[in-house]
Amino acid sequence: MAKKDYYEVLGLQKGASENDIKRAYKRLASKHHPDKNQGSKDAEEKFKEINEAYEVLGDAEKRAAYDQYGHAAFEQGGGAGGFGGGFGGGGFGGFEDIFSEMFGGGFGSGGRRQRVVRGDDLRYDIEISLEEAVKGCKKDIRISTLAECDTCHGSGAEKGSKVETCSHCHGSGRIRRQQGFFVTEAVCPSCHGSGKKIEKPCKSCHGDGRVQKAKNLSVTIPAGVDTGNQLRLSGEGAAGENGAPAGDLYVVIHVREHDIFERDGSNLYCEVPISFTMAALGGEIEVPTLDGKLKLKIPAETQTGKLFRVRGKGVTSPRGGYAGDLICKVVVETPVALNDEQKDLLRKLEESLASKSKHRPQQEGFLDSVKNFFSNLGKH
């Protein structure tokens, strides 16, 4: 089945900005997160699609390659694999690997080196609150992974059983065949790539040397992380074959939406409602921050939509020590559920202001613009 266009997966056009991509990813990842859609295979598949699309479009180099070549940029033989080679220890071989496949072995190896396969990289998606993302936290997680077999300690053989070098591939785990000027290489059908023959395979792991296990880990999440950030836990992935190194675990961060604050990079935004009398006369109000409340002075004649910046009350960057700002947007509330006396007072206030344009500069400016518009319209 052909892969969907990554821009289409995130609901974006090809020319979308980095912020557009990030916002779309946050929204969709939160909507389709497995924790919110337990048991839904459709949501799980959609979540995987969204993450795959963001891994490419969220990286400038990968996005450029995708824009030029499409999905072909990431197929075997070209392009880049997610997380430095992709989940599964695959990716692209180096110069030596290419020559090994073509001419029968690494430089100076003689083609008899036992195959060493690093363990798979694993991915774990975790959802945290905005407070946890801003201040940092520790999270206990439980993952399922391939671990070294406790019974045979990774050998794949029962205790006392013989483990011999495979006579078919001489321990390399690969079979080479020459066809004219070319040499092809394939996994040894006798030992299935292990390079060894076991007399009595371990009953616990069936000769693989690894078993599926649940593992508990404590993850330290640094302050300042955001949705899409990845934490690499070296060696916490699946165990490798034949004693090879384990892969890595990548913990992918998802920050839940907050009831009060919205985050954009290092800055936090919130809307603060004030009464129309406070807006007209000025005063002092309390505004929330992630560290508690603080006082904010509202000058007289404040209009709705005015922004107030509280420096240093945003998010501290994990790369530096720089803290962003809290930006409060004032929203002037219209009074509701008025009694007759209150309505009369407002009517009297309106009458006292009606003939004086200086009291309503925005309205007068708007009316002047409308008059000019229609005046110019009649000249054409």
Swiss-Prot record:
GO terms for cellular component: cytoplasm. A zinc finger (CR-type) spans 136-214. Pfam families: DnaJ, DnaJ_C, DnaJ_CXXCXGXG. Keywords: Chaperone, Cytoplasm, DNA replication, Metal-binding, Repeat, Stress response, Zinc, Zinc-finger. GO terms for biological process: chaperone cofactor-dependent protein refolding; DNA replication; protein refolding; response to heat. SUPFAM superfamilies: Chaperone J-domain (SSF46565), DnaJ/Hsp40 cysteine-rich domain (SSF57938), HSP40/DnaJ peptide-binding domain (SSF49493). CXXCXGXG motif repeats lie at residues 149-156, 166-173, 188-195, 202-209. Residues 5-70 form the J domain. Gene3D superfamilies: DnaJ domain, Heat shock protein DnaJ, cysteine-rich domain, Urease metallochaperone UreE, N-terminal domain. GO terms for molecular function: ATP binding; heat shock protein binding; unfolded protein binding; zinc ion binding. InterPro entries: DnaJ, DnaJ_C, DnaJ_domain, DnaJ_domain_CS, HSP40/DnaJ_pept-bd, HSP_DnaJ_Cys-rich_dom, HSP_DnaJ_Cys-rich_dom_sf, J_dom_sf. Belongs to the DnaJ family. The J domain is necessary and sufficient to stimulate DnaK ATPase activity. Zinc center 1 plays an important role in the autonomous, DnaK-independent chaperone activity of DnaJ. Zinc center 2 is essential for interaction with DnaK and for DnaJ activity. Participates actively in the response to hyperosmotic and heat shock by preventing the aggregation of stress-denatured proteins and by disaggregating proteins, also in an autonomous, DnaK-independent fashion. Unfolded proteins bind initially to DnaJ; upon interaction with the DnaJ-bound protein, DnaK hydrolyzes its bound ATP, resulting in the formation of a stable complex. GrpE releases ADP from DnaK; ATP binding to DnaK triggers the release of the substrate protein, thus completing the reaction cycle. This is Chaperone protein DnaJ. It comes from Actinobacillus pleuropneumoniae serotype 3 (strain JL03). The lineage of its organism: Bacteria, Pseudomonadati, Pseudomonadota, Gammaproteobacteria, Pasteurellales. The gene is dnaJ.
